[in-house]
Amino acid sequence: IDRLPPYVFNITAELKMAARRRGEDIIDFSMGNPDGATPPHIVEKLCTVAQRPDTHGYSTSRGIPRLRRAISRWYQDRYDVEIDPESEAIVTIGSKEGLAHLMLATLDHGDTVLVPNPSYPIHIYGAVIAGAQVRSVPLVEGVDFFNELERAIRESYPKPKMMILGFPSNPTAQCVELEFFEKVVALAKRYDVLVVHDLAYADIVYDGWKAPSIMQVPGARDVAVEFFTLSKSYNMAGWRIGFMVGNKTLVSALARIKSYHDYGTFTPLQVAAIAALEGDQQCVRDIAEQYKRRRDVLVKGLHEAGWMVEMPKASMYVWAKIPEPYAAMGSLEFAKKLLNEAKVCVSPGIGFGDYGDTHVRFALIENRDRIRQAIRGIKAMFRADGLLPASSKHIHENAE
């Protein structure tokens, strides 16, 4: 446990709760926790199945066969990829559980794992919990991530056993095309490295862009697995259900460790997940469209304040470089300042890795009126610091 540092996000969470206890109205962009309702047809299926007396026993660690077949059809319909539901698919209690258990099942003390920096914390600390050594690969502006990945493999001793990837990225919202995965699979085969890809934001995409799956690459299943969670696409974060597909050996390894750790997900939840994957997908498009509208309001408002953040083309996040006058503070102190003075709560980039300390992350979990209120608070803070003249909407400084 000593290898796990205190969770940075707890610091801002505690400050947020303290402010709310004082009666302050805090606009919360900190956690990527969907605020919308799960689509009604999914909830109705859960309620119907939960009424049956034969659905309340232990499930199976791999997941019920009907759901694994639905997962296979989902990949076929979406990516034109064939997945064997018996040997290449497994249901997980959300992707976070699956990622952590997969690393426990496959990594030994002393193994090296390559992880982007910044990255979703479980990508880093799942390996740490398993006793592995993590080598960070910079995922930052102006650096070719694939070249850095290849260099890390060549220079690491012992040779890395696994790389953990996640695109669209949390927290950076960085995206890749299928060509990137083609190069990753070739690289992994050349150096005999396993690839774990987290496709959590497959559906949260904008402006006509589509997120590729690593499973679309011929031969990917020789070296790779991919996780998907229903949390974001279907507003099912609290339901804790997802799945992993791909390499048979890794699927079997995860199934074995899960057979000791859990009895799988509550059966009515799994049947509801079938309804999600096989039902009308307009609800998914509607959820993505809601995030897009929020993205547009937030980015436009920050630009009006002179905070020139990039417009993400996927994910539910805006990865915002700290304006130059505040850059020396680092992300945690800047996040505290936003909370105290603008009444806006964000995630400090340092919580995602050292290379994230120049940024903060906004999660698009507040409605548009609340986002506009947040922009007013940020502008007021900038004005108080002399960066935004009282009569102007713009900061006269180089914020990016």
Q: What positions do the PLM features span?
A:
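PLP-dependent class I/II
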Residues: 2-7, 17-27, 33-49, 76, ...
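Short, structured beta/alpha segment
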Residues: 9-12
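Helix-loop-beta segment of a Rossmann-like dinucleotide-binding subdomain
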Residues: 55-56, 100
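Short beta-strand to alpha-helix junction loop
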Residues: 60-63
